[in-house]
Amino acid sequence: MKHIEIYTDGSCLGNPGPGGYGAVLLFNQHSKELSQGFVHTTNNRMELLATIEALASLTETCKVDLTTDSQYVKNGINQWIKNWRKNGWRTSDKKPVKNVDLWKRLDEQVGRHDVKWHWVKGHSGHPMNERCDVLARDAASGKSLLPDEGFQG
């Protein structure tokens, strides 16, 4: 099984507002960068989408070390999602899970791979996190912004 390192970040100019995600995938001596901007979205949606798109870009099952600066993503996938799924995608206080469209997609992608999650403090000088931040911010301020079809706000 191939071992891939993935680094992700999301950015939003306004929250909600124009947003983007960035991801860097490393395999042996190869690297691949992914990014996309959206017209109107949130930071959390971009953090989720970065991980989804990075995992979805893998064409076979892989062992993945995924590093994010989002506690929301890391805690959601490691702690909260099992109960959300069990409770019909509702939180412990019976409210609908926010960003459920993306959580379902992430759940599906994580199921395809052996993922180990890592957290790094954002803007702390971690080279790959900083690169993802640049990709995400550049995408958010770019000209080819897409609609975020799942955004409700």
From Swiss-Prot:
InterPro entries, sorted: RNase_H (IPR050092), RNaseH-like_sf (IPR012337), RNaseH_domain (IPR002156), RNaseH_sf (IPR036397), RNaseHI (IPR022892)
Main subcellular location: cytoplasm
Keyword terms: Cytoplasm, Endonuclease, Hydrolase, Magnesium, Metal-binding, Nuclease
Binding site for Mg(2+) 1: 9, 47, 69
EC number: 3.1.26.4
GO CC terms of this entry: cytoplasm
Gene3D superfamilies: Ribonuclease H-like superfamily/Ribonuclease H (3.30.420.10)
Occurrences of domain RNase H type-1 (ranges): 1-141
Cofactor(s) listed: Mg(2+)
Example of a GO MF term: RNA-DNA hybrid ribonuclease activity
Catalytic activity: Endonucleolytic cleavage to 5'-phosphomonoester
Residue sites binding Mg(2+) 2 per the record: 9, 133
Recorded superkingdom: Bacteria
First and last residue of the signal peptide: none
Single GO biological process annotation from the record: DNA replication, removal of RNA primer
Compartments, record wording: Cytoplasm
Class of enzymatic activity (EC top level): hydrolase
Cofactor note: Binds 1 Mg(2+) ion per subunit. May bind a second metal ion at a regulatory site, or after substrate binding.
Description of how the protein assembles with itself and partners: Monomer.
Function: Endonuclease that specifically degrades the RNA of RNA-DNA hybrids.
Record family assignment: Belongs to the RNase H family.
Database matches in PANTHER family: RIBONUCLEASE H1
Name of the protein in question: Ribonuclease H
Species: Pseudoalteromonas atlantica (strain T6c / ATCC BAA-1087)
Name of the gene this protein is made from: rnhA
